[in-house]
Amino acid sequence: MNKKIIIVTGGFGTIGLALSKSLLKQGHKVIVVDTRINKLGNNNANLFTIKANLNKENEIKKLITLCGTKFKKVDALVHCSYPKTKDWGVKLEKLKQKSLNENLNNQLGSTIIISKNIINLFLKQNHGNLILLSSIMGMNNPKFETYKGTKMSSPIEYSAIKSGIISITKYLAKYYAKKNLKINCVSPGGIEDNLPKRFVKNYKKQCNFKGLLDPKDVVDAINFLLSEKSNFISGQNIVIDDGYSL
């Protein structure tokens, strides 16, 4: 892959951190946008960190303007940011409208606004690559039996948000066809993250081989979409789930 300048939102999260590490290792310039503590240190000249509230369009515009001015171009943006309310994950019966509206705005609304603004920069450059992060829960109904015996659940708003991101991807790819842009999304299955043993066991029964994924499994697919090998792929949802969604 040619050396690129890449923005990673949510770059200190589970998938975002693994992606940022991978990109830095390959020699790319990586601009991590996150409100969390820097987990990558300050010893890499190719790493740049920015704190920004991605729910506010004025901050998004400032961020993208800053990157465009400082680096002269931005080759790609990978949107891994995943802000949640404190009561995220409650069962449907306990879901409150205020929380629902906030999560839809924070995750789905901000995805549209971020996409709109980075694409404006891409159009000025006459090239760009946008990768959004969805989920297999945006493709199919949850397999509720997987959660039996645990306190976990799959929130209805999560399915709505992630299916919306797949639709946004396809819409944008079609809307900006013939503009020399690549716009795709990635839908991972469950990621290993100190989850209950019962859930891990139930989940693996639904898969072909591995079960829960490592962040690296998702990063490999994102790296492919960032590379020249995917030059003629756009508007697609790439699924990485070890067969869970079958």
Summary of predicted features, one role per range:
Residues 20, 105-127, 134-138, 173-174, ...:
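Amphipathic alpha-helical dimer-interface segment in Rossmann-like NAD(P)H-dependent oxidoreductases
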Residues 75, 93-113, 127, 131, ...:
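Catalytic Tyr-X3-Lys loop
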Residues 78-88, 242-243:
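Conserved NAD(P)H cofactor-binding loop of Rossmann-fold oxidoreductase domains
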Residues 177, 182, 233-235:
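Short, small/polar-rich loop/turn modules that mediate ligand/substrate recognition or access, typified
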